[in-house]
């Protein structure tokens, strides 16, 4: 009986132990892009793989002497990352399917472009462990796909200069992110 109780007492703390399977992060560099709010959630699928879902949102329009400036967007992405050494630590490479609705104008010229983009992206980077629960992620990514757009003379006038559809290849992320691992 004493051995059984001792065994139970030794093994009981292991019942509450879980691996760090989830991550929640925000890209600090994206806030410099006219205040684009963002979040990414990841789940460990194994030692080397995790699935992720990300969202970016920017509803802001700023006023300058030349008129309104905006880089408004709503973006969704879903994908996976491969970690050669161990999940949430070291180098990684990833891919994602993405969709974006955007309205950008008044930044370099009064011309405004809005539309929808659909495509896929590749990214890579490095996760530096600050603590067992907090990472600093640095990375870069590109994405390409189809862009359906309209071009307007200015952000508020509504005079259409053109419409179209084209393929694109654009930088997607310049990442300096804080990730909470739990």
PLM segments and residue spans:
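Sec/Tat signal peptide C-region and signal peptidase I cleavage site
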Residues: 15-19
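Predominantly the C-terminal beta-signal and adjacent terminal strand-loop region
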Residues: 131-182
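Gram-negative (and chloroplast) outer-membrane scaffold detector with strong preference
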Residues: 43-138, 177-180
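Solvent-exposed loop/turn segments connecting transmembrane beta-strands
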Residues: 23-40, 58, 64-70
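Extracytoplasmic loops and strand-loop junctions of Gram-negative outer membrane beta-barrel proteins
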Residues: 21-24, 61-63, 105-109, 157-163
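Residues that define the transmembrane beta-barrel architecture of outer-membrane proteins
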Residues: 20-22, 33-37, 70-76, 114-120, ...
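Positively charged n-region of N-terminal signal peptides that target proteins for export
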Residues: 1-4
């Amino acid at each position: 009986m004493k051995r059984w109780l001792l065994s139970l007492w030794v093994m009981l703390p292991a019942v509450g132990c879980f691996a760090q399977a989830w991550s929640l992060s925000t890209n600090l560099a994206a806030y410099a892009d006219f205040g684009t709010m963002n979040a990414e959630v990841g789940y460990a699928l194994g030692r080397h793989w995790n699935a992720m879902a990300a969202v970016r949102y920017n509803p802001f329009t700023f006023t300058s002497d030349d008129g309104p400036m905006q880089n408004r967007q709503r973006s969704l992405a879903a994908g996976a990352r491969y970690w050669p050494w161990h999940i949430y630590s070291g180098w990684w490479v990833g891919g994602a399917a993405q969709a974006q609705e955007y309205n950008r104008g008044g930044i370099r010229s009064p011309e405004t472009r809005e539309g929808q983009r659909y495509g896929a992206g590749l990214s890579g980077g490095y996760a530096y462990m600050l603590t067992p629960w907090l990472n600093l992620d640095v990375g870069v990514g590109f994405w390409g796909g189809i862009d359906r757009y309209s071009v307007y003379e200015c952000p508020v006038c509504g005079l259409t200069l053109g419409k179209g559809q084209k393929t694109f290849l654009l930088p997607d992320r310049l990442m300096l992110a804080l990730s909470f691992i739990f």
